[in-house]
C-alpha cells in the first residue's frame, strides 16, 4: 500500500475538483488502491489540460511534450523529474505501462489544432489512446491481465465521454465528429454500446481486484442509450442521468462487481 503523502493528497484534490466522476469511483474503491488510482487520474487530468494551456500551438506542444518526457523517464527506469503528479506516478506505473504515455500524449495533440479526424478508424484510435490507455493503466495496476478486454470496454466508455464533450469541443472550434447528423451520432453511440456488450460478456475473466479500474464506465451504457434514442441531446449538452440515478448506479456496480 502506497502511503498518502503531500503529493498524493494534492493529486486527490486535483481529481476531486477536475474529474468528480472518477473521484467518486476512487472513493468507492478499497482504501488500499486509492493512492495509485489518484496518481493515474491526476496524470490524466494534467495531460488532458496541457493542449489547452495556451492558444499558441508551440507553447501547447511544449506542455504536451513535457509529459511525453515524463513517460520516457518512468519507462526507462531512471530518475524522474520532481513534480507533485509525476513523482507518485513513477512509483505506481511499471515501465511497460509508462510506455503508453507517449501515445496518450500524441493523441492529445489533436486538441491543439482544428483538423478533423481523417476517418472512423482515426477517431477510434484517438479514443483508444486516451480512454483506452487510461483505463488499461488503472486496471493493470490493480491486477488485470486481459488488455484487449479492458480496451474494448474502454472504447464504449470513451465514446460516451466523447459525446458528452462535443459541445465544449465545438465551442472551441474543433471538429470532433465525422458525421454530426442525428443518424451519425446514433450510429457512433451504437458502436459504443456494442463494445460494452462484448466486454461485459467476458466479465467473468477479469480479476475482481481490477474492478475499481473499470468503475469509471458505470454511466456509459445509459449515456449511449440516450444518444441513440435522442441524438439531439449531444449538441444540447444534456446527456446524463439524475444525481440519484448516478449515485445509485455506482453503488450497484460496486456492490455487485458487475462493471
Label for each model-derived stretch:
Residues 94-97:
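Long, charge-dense
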Residues 111-147:
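Helix-hairpin-helix/helix-loop-helix acidic hairpins
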Residues 1-90, 101-105, 127-136, 146-158, ...:
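Catalytic cores of Mg2+-dependent Asp-rich isoprenoid enzymes
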